A protein has these predicted regions:
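Basic, polyanion-binding surface patches
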Residues: 1-117
Length: 117
């Protein structure tokens, strides 16, 4: 959770009001080749998306993932993301908390087969 405070900071401060917010957070940016947004060099994973549509009445937006970048330091010997190395966190909107990700609780595309019979 090395960058928790820095990520929170750049999310709550407007670049229109604080021009050096990345520098203040200790981040360095690289221009994306896929979307009109910066990539934060210090973060291990970037999921780059383009907006497909947005409904202002419900605040629901749909996006399309156009690129995923992963730092080699968080890959395992098979080239897959090692979640323990990446140490991702998620935002809990119900409680305004950040939570650590990582405990395996099941097998995707497999556990549900028990109900098919």
């Amino acid at each position: 959770m090395l960058f928790r405070s820095a990520c929170d900071y750049v999310g709550i401060v407007s670049g229109n009001k604080v021009t050096d917010k990345f520098a203040k957070a200790g981040f360095h940016a690289t221009k994306s080749d896929f979307v009109d947004a910066p990539l934060i060099d210090e973060l291990a994973v970037a999921i780059e998306c383009k907006l497909k549509d947005y409904d202002p009445d419900t605040c629901i937006l749909r996006g399309e993932i156009v690129n995923v970048s992963v730092d080699e330091r968080v890959l395992d010997e098979n080239g897959k993301v090692n979640v323990a190395k990446a140490a991702p966190i998620i935002f809990d909107p119900f409680n305004n908390d950040y939570l650590r990700v990582g405990e395996k609780v099941g097998n995707a595309f497999s556990d549900g087969k028990l109900l098919k019979t």
